[in-house]
Amino acid sequence: MAKEIPDLVAEARAGTGKGAARQARREGKVPGIVYGDGKEPQPIQIEFNSLLTKLRAGRFMSTLWNLKVEGQDDVRVVCRGVQRDVVKDLPTHIDFMRLHRNTRVNLFIHVNFENQDEAPGLKRGGTLVVVRPEVELVVTASDIPEQITVDLTGKQIGDTIHINDVVLPKGVKPTIDRNFVIANIAAPSGLRSADNEEAAAESEATEA
């Protein structure tokens, strides 16, 4: 299932240059520009509070947005730069790049863990420790997966799940060439305490 692309509502901005940008800010807007895909740059402005909320939510720069401007066709964009006030650290200008449907882009994709009831390690009281609830992947703009799935069937206490253990959708790959950890199954605290006591007893016996 393709991932739902969040909307980002903006307005067309008639003027360009510093004067027009200052006017936009006085009106509670953040001026910006949309470029790329072989088309003319499009000046826009976004409502300040709406943009600030999205920026503070995180992952703004690595999210694919469906840009909606009244009177124009929706376009898929990614943010390529946010200028901020040096004192207040608030956005003063924003740049977006248009994406063609075949464009490859880096995005964070949710990790879903299934068949937890089929994992012996969890049945014994182990805990699923999620190291990466999202994974940054290289995907095609027209076919972004909703999530990637980790099958926990047969997983035991002490098992570790790496990215290479996950079957990724066709055409999708990690952004980094390393077999990083996604999650592991940790022993319950009682079992860890018993193991530690047993190890300590063995150590004392050896020393004696």
Swiss-Prot record:
The family database entries (Pfam families) matched by this protein are listed as: Ribosomal_L25p, Ribosomal_TL5_C
Could you tell me which CDD domains the record lists for this protein?
Ribosomal_L25_TL5_CTC (cd00495)
What InterPro entries does the record tag this protein with? Rbsml_bL25/Gln-tRNA_synth_N, Ribosomal_bL25/Gln-tRNA_synth, Ribosomal_bL25_b-dom, Ribosomal_bL25_C, Ribosomal_bL25_long, Ribosomal_L25_dom, Ribosomal_uL5_bac-type
Q: Report if keyword Coiled coil is assigned.
A: no
Keyword RNA-binding listed? The answer is yes
- GO CC terms in record: cytosolic large ribosomal subunit
Q: Keywords for this entry?
A: Ribonucleoprotein, Ribosomal protein, RNA-binding, rRNA-binding
Tell me which domain of life the UniProt entry assigns to the organism this sequence originates from: Bacteria
Q: Which GO terms describe its biological process?
A: translation
UniProt-recorded Gene Ontology molecular function terms = 5S rRNA binding; structural constituent of ribosome
What is the role of the protein in this entry? This is one of the proteins that binds to the 5S RNA in the ribosome where it forms part of the central protuberance.
Q: How does it assemble?
A: Part of the 50S ribosomal subunit; part of the 5S rRNA/L5/L18/L25 subcomplex. Contacts the 5S rRNA. Binds to the 5S rRNA independently of L5 and L18.
Report the family membership.
Belongs to the bacterial ribosomal protein bL25 family. CTC subfamily.
Q: What is this protein called?
A: Large ribosomal subunit protein bL25
Origin organism is Paracoccus denitrificans (strain Pd 1222)
The record lists the lineage as: Bacteria, Pseudomonadati, Pseudomonadota, Alphaproteobacteria, Rhodobacterales
This protein's encoding gene: rplY
